[in-house]
Amino acid sequence: MASKDRILRQKEETRCNILNAAYDIVKEEGWLGLNMRKIADRIEYTAPIIYEYFSNKDAILNELTKKGFLELTQKLKTAKEEAASPEEALEKMWLAFWDYAFSDKELYQVMFGVEMTCCLMQCAEAENPYRLFTDTISEVMGNPAHEIVKQKYFTFFSIIHGLISINIIGNGLPVEMNTQILRDAISGIIHSLKVAA
């Protein structure tokens, strides 16, 4: 039994090493620099060993995408818990979303397809941020029809993700200006939620 446990631990450790190596390569070279051979070289294995754990590069991207959505969800939950009202929660959550995008730019890129194709396999974890935001929007608006909440979510997402994407690609606006644009957008949309409620 101990031998089976050890083998399972070693397999999980190798799997984690593959994902960590992939992420390190992406941090150094970008997503276009990632391939199975580089991962194998990084962890000192042969490429066929990598394929025992992940069928292809997309499978690795999918796992990293899941990781990103789990991390983002946790940051959004924390932001929501720190707020005194649904309106404040919404503001803190979108600010946390913004902060996450720049603190882990590479994962954000694969999660949302910025300067690359996002992961083709949908992961259930991608729904968690959406649910957190729509639940909070619904609270602010007094529980309107789901279609209205969905529309308001995508209004927020379109503006904030668009601003993030522009900054990742690089437009050279000063940080202070970006922050003011972000805060103006968030407060404007929150105001529209309260008016519509």
Spans of features found by a protein language model:
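N-terminal intrinsically disordered/low-complexity leader segments
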Residues: 1-13, 195-197
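Generic hydrophobic, amphipathic alpha-helix propensity
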Residues: 11-22, 39, 64-68, 72, ...
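Helix-turn-helix
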Residues: 17, 21, 25-59
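Amphipathic alpha-helical segments enriched in hydrophobic/aromatic and basic residues
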Residues: 26, 35-36, 57, 61-68, ...
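Amphipathic alpha-helical linker/stalk segments
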Residues: 66-90, 123, 132-135, 139-140
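Hydrophobic alpha-helical connector segments
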Residues: 77-106, 143-144, 153-156
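Amphipathic alpha-helical packing segments from all-alpha helical-bundle domains
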Residues: 100, 118-143, 150-154, 180-191
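Amphipathic C-terminal alpha-helical segment
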Residues: 103, 110, 157-175, 189-197
